């Protein structure tokens, strides 16, 4: 058996999320359907670097699957894209050692979150969070700096989070303004359920002047979801890049 690693992108608008769900359209479901056709009806399980929720997008999700087929690496994207719907694309594929795992071998993940602060744009409604308020980018970057490092992120994850260990390391956290768009960028060794969206929702409150940047430190210390801000909507979030050891 060969293990194939693929980098994929998808528009999450019309998906119930990445992970397979009964009676619902999912990214994993579309990938496994396409692979089943290529394997002449044989089921092939797909493993991903992590799950994304309904309406969340991916620019650089990573998956792997095992196959007995001898299709060359460079032909896998073309073969799969011919069978996948228009809102999922395989960008590249390569054979990897059997020790590689799309989820368990991850070293870093980068998420980006897009916020539109200008007038409502009907063509961007599925891809940015419309937030038409004056915000201070320097204040938000000051707030984000408190998140860099290793912390218990209990305050910044959903109460539905199933994992016990809520300690994560954030390596980079920043927001930049490009015209009428704010782009949040967070790089870490892993992220809890809704963590990026809660961080964005809270930091936007700092940007609006409703909180001071130093409150982020207090929120972390309290380890209480109710003291952080609202969860920003899913459609502004992108899984941008997943890093592994070479």
From Swiss-Prot:
It is an enzyme of class 5 (isomerase). This is tRNA pseudouridine synthase A. The keyword Cytoplasm does not apply. It comes from Anoxybacillus flavithermus (strain DSM 21510 / WK1). Formation of pseudouridine at positions 38, 39 and 40 in the anticodon stem and loop of transfer RNAs. The active site is at 53 (nucleophile). One of its GO terms (molecular function) is RNA binding. PANTHER family: PSEUDOURIDYLATE SYNTHASE, TRNA PSEUDOURIDINE SYNTHASE-LIKE 1. It holds the Pfam family PseudoU_synth_1. Homodimer. It catalyses: uridine(38/39/40) in tRNA = pseudouridine(38/39/40) in tRNA. GO terms for biological process: tRNA pseudouridine synthesis. The lineage of its organism: Bacteria, Bacillati, Bacillota, Bacilli, Bacillales. Belongs to the tRNA pseudouridine synthase TruA family. InterPro entries: PsdUridine_synth_cat_dom_sf, PsdUridine_synth_TruA, PsdUridine_synth_TruA_a/b_dom, PsdUridine_synth_TruA_C, TruA/RsuA/RluB/E/F_N.
